[in-house]
């Protein structure tokens, strides 16, 4: 049962990838979706056994690293953390597979697409079930590879090529941090499996543990798109919309947060690293919320909301509230997948149009999709008693208790205001405002088939009820919850969210009568700064990439390639041989007495 949850998605990927022409588009969709349904069923049984019955399971399959220096087994670990992640990964992936069978209808490469999705799911399951760092790193690299393949699925588009390469290269920076962390762990502890490392971590010097945690956090920053290495995430929207839902809701971006939660015994021995994690998480939540406020691409608005919510999860890890971070990760998966798939339904209805300025008035054409996006947006905003309310507000309450990190609480609260503002802006521009769509496109907009709408219904139910149904299970993992927070602080996120939503409605409905900020010098400068994503791409390209390129051209190309290596390589050898042959040819003078002298 335990191994099947891992192998069945791999079987679906292999069959769809190798025999796609034999089974056809429908066959590939049905087979891969069926494999994921089986995997989801086993995940539910594993959740019942490990989480509800408190039965942790370890499975050693084979020894795959065996030397005098290090020994590592290929093994599986099923505990409460793994069980929750399996539910999230397999449920979201199953619904994305079903949605893709309709969304990708007519594409000539559907079997390849379904194969990539199943392979993506397999590597994520491998990542969350690993019992040691090297095996986790295999899944870590696997989801990175699959994200490259899926973002670049429409490989004839130059923007998709650039986005896929960017995602791969930016994540390489984080991967280097992860590799350095593994080397430091092995050097410090002499082992790489979780159980051994966590049992002896208290004996290690705090400085070494802090260094290990910072290296691990660099890996998490790359994968979970935190401040500085977040630039690949909005560009990943070049892939098909189901890919965006899978990457942002259940797989790749959650891997970094999972790494922090899994490594929590290490982080608890490094207070300085926890402070860095909190600072970066809170700044990411605020930064991404401000950028999402001015984006015009429907999918990019949701992408930046993902980045902001990941900041909340990382901030919770920095506050040592790992169970609450996992709770928000699980809740976020449902309403974020709902938002992305609903956005895919809108794009599908408008003949692949993604610019919100060219939409509007769709509430009459696709009312079902409108309802789904409203549910997802309200849950994202933390509207009372929806799924997001139980975890997002709890993170902010717990941040209030940290006096030396009080700024994290206020950044989080203000980010909640901005989240409500850009969520209402998305709804208003897409569905309520006067339409700017082309007449022939707008007149033909309609809801999709059952396999487009069924996943949305199930995700909507999750976005409404999952938080309420699972809060007692997740909260039971916590040792303590602060009982002294004033009621006003508890209500503050909701009040700020309602204020942000109301402000967005007023500004977009009556903006022409109130003010003309975007055309004023200050408003234009602020809008440009936010729309350009705080100029991060310019800063990275101008100050980092170009200088590295110049340095590489000067040292690697001119000094080494065209200098030292040429002298001791082909150019030096050729010049030496030419001189040698000239010296030898000079001996052949044609004079008899010279030859006689040489003989003597």
Swiss-Prot record:
Gene3D superfamilies: 1.20.5.2700. GO terms for molecular function: NADH dehydrogenase (ubiquinone) activity. The chain crosses the membrane at residues 1-21, 27-47, 81-101, 110-130, 136-156, 178-198, 200-220, 241-261, 274-294, 301-323, 327-347, 366-386, 404-424, 450-470, 488-508, 520-540. Keywords: Electron transport, Membrane, Mitochondrion, Mitochondrion inner membrane, NAD, Respiratory chain, Translocase, Transmembrane, Transmembrane helix, Transport, Ubiquinone. Signal peptide: none annotated. GO terms for biological process: ATP synthesis coupled electron transport; electron transport coupled proton transport. InterPro entries: NADH_DH_su5_C, NADHpl_OxRdtase_5_subgr, ND/Mrp_TM, NU5C-like, Proton_antipo_N. GO terms for cellular component: mitochondrial inner membrane. Its EC number is 7.1.1.2. It is a multi-pass membrane protein. It is found in: Mitochondrion inner membrane. It catalyses: a ubiquinone + NADH + 5 H(+)(in) = a ubiquinol + NAD(+) + 4 H(+)(out). Core subunit of the mitochondrial membrane respiratory chain NADH dehydrogenase (Complex I) that is believed to belong to the minimal assembly required for catalysis. Complex I functions in the transfer of electrons from NADH to the respiratory chain. The immediate electron acceptor for the enzyme is believed to be ubiquinone. NCBIfam families: NDH_I_L (TIGR01974), PRK06590.1 (NF005141). Belongs to the complex I subunit 5 family. This is NADH-ubiquinone oxidoreductase chain 5.
